[in-house]
From Swiss-Prot:
One of its GO terms (cellular component) is membrane. Keywords: Membrane, Transmembrane, Transmembrane helix. This is Uncharacterized protein TP_0481. It is a single-pass membrane protein. The chain crosses the membrane at residues 107-129. It is found in: Membrane. It comes from Treponema pallidum (strain Nichols).
Length: 477
């Protein structure tokens, strides 16, 4: 009988709370040191590896006997199943073993063989339908390039011999569908397949035979019209439409097109030349003088003819008076004729005097107007010369020391035109960026005043054309 006072050794059986569980086979077999090392290497988490090593039993050496003789001894290691006291430990070990069982080798030969078989099947299919693919490529590409039908009797792509043949190749004329643009009897090309796999087309032999132009066709070579794609009418989302409408409303003042237009107006030589030519006064005066000169010449030519005719008439009347014989005036009719002759001479003389006065008055007016045009033309030439000199000075200034100011002005023009009434906020943001890049000031009132003045100068609106500005040209900004 056993003594009740003797302490009992606690049982090392696993206490299961539910159904009976068994340990995974990975922890039930024995391992050599080499195989154990490989097994532990498959446990990638260091904590799990250390946890499994807690249950390793002491290694046992087993002798190996061959033909009744002990040649050597082999060492084996097992996991101590009796040390697993709780079901939680059993569950964790089984989970580790399950994760190891899910691991596969680096090369899955079944998947590799299936992939190779698929590639070979695809290559075989491509080889079988290679001529169909080549025909589609040649015919479709030719029709897309020439815009007319294309026919070919034979299209052969021999990949093993690296040879491409094309027979009876004809392309119709786009503008004359019943005529061929050209027709080729045979095309034979031997190419390098290795260079083609590298993305290069290297042909050793290329033979083109039987090229003819403008040959008649039996069928029309016009392509059928393309079918228009049906547009799906999708119902718009009210929320998305509202968001897009609000975004368009906010982005409406921002127009980079207006900024580029203003920038173009500042630097485009053609616009600058047109602006300067329009501002010149000399071309307008030249056109005015050119329009007035033919009128003056025509009027004074007519005046010369009229004055010459009037002078001849007056001279004839005076000659008639001088030839009048006053002693022969004895009867009433002779006296009457003499009086009429004198009267005609008087009227002719008065008309000649009136014509002379009119010509003198018109001549004075034309002389005054001509002198006025001359003075105006001289002033215009002087003003245009001064304007050209200012433009040249501005250009020299741009090329020399004023380049930075000119570029800064162009940037300001672009930003002001692009962001419209958002420009003050953009300018303020640029001021903040410049202020963050500068070294901190000493806090003196002069430094603060200079900073405020510079900020106001940056945010002020543009005053006008930056390239050149005069009293006769209006600002373009």
């Amino acid at each position: 009988m056993s003594d009740d006072s003797t302490p009992k050794t606690p049982s090392r059986r696993i206490r299961h709370t539910g159904r009976r569980r068994t340990l995974h086979r990975f922890f039930c077999k024995r391992y050599t040191p080499r195989s154990l090392k490989r097994f532990l290497r498959r446990i990638h988490i260091p904590a799990d590896r250390a946890y499994c090593m807690r249950y390793l039993a002491d290694p046992v050496s087993t002798p190996v006997r061959v033909f009744g003789r002990t040649l050597l001894s082999r060492t084996y290691v097992r996991f101590d199943q009796q040390a697993i006291a709780h079901s939680a430990d059993l569950k964790r070990l089984n989970a580790i073993a399950a994760s190891i069982a899910k691991q596969r080798g680096r090369v899955n030969f079944w998947s590799l063989s299936m992939a190779c078989a698929s590639v070979l099947a695809l290559l075989g299919l491509v080889y079988l339908i290679r001529n169909v693919i080549a025909r589609r490529v040649v015919i479709g590409g030719s029709e897309a390039v020439f815009g007319a039908r294309c026919e070919a009797a034979v299209v052969d792509l021999d990949l093993f011999n690296a040879r491409f043949r094309l027979k009876n190749y004809a392309v119709a004329n786009k503008h004359h569908p019943m005529w061929n643009l050209f027709e080729i009897e045979s095309i034979d090309i031997h190419f390098d397949l290795l260079e083609l796999s590298r993305g290069k087309f290297v042909s050793h032999t290329m033979v083109v035979e039987g090229v003819t132009w403008n040959t008649p066709r039996k069928t029309s070579g016009a392509l059928p019209p393309r079918r228009a794609k049906r547009q799906r009418v999708r119902s718009s989302n009210p929320l998305i439409a509202k968001i897009q409408e609000k975004a368009a409303e906010l982005a409406a003042p921002v127009s980079f097109g207006a900024g580029f237009s203003a920038l173009k107006a500042q630097v485009d030589p053609r616009i600058l030349l047109e602006r300067e030519v329009k501002a010149l006064k000399t071309p307008t005066l030249v056109q005015h003088v050119g329009a007035q000169a033919p009128k003056l010449a025509e009027r004074w030519t007519q005046r010369v003819f009229d004055a010459h005719a009037r002078a001849e008439k007056t001279v004839a009347a005076i000659r008639a008076v001088t030839e009048l014989d006053f002693h022969a005036l004895k009867d009433v009719s002779a006296i009457k004729q003499g009086i009429e002759t004198l009267d005609r001479a008087r009227r002719s003389t008065e008309e000649a005097l009136a014509t002379a006065r009119t010509i003198s008055h018109e001549l004075q007016q034309d002389v005054h107007s001509t002198l006025g045009l001359a003075r105006e033309f001289a002033a215009a030439v002087k003003a245009d010369g001064a304007r050209i000199a200012r433009a040249a000075a501005a250009i020299r200034d741009i090329q020399a020391d004023g380049g930075k100011k000119f570029i800064s002005g162009l940037c300001t023009v672009f930003l002001a035109r692009s962001f419209s009434h958002y420009y003050p906020y953009v300018a303020q943001m640029l001021d903040y960026v410049r202020g963050s890049q500068r070294t901190p000031s000493d806090g003196s009132p002069s430094a603060e005043a200079e900073k405020t003045a510079q900020s106001l100068t940056t945010r002020k609106r543009l005053q006008g054309v930056i390239f050149c500005l005069s009293a006769t040209s209006l600002p373009c900004c």
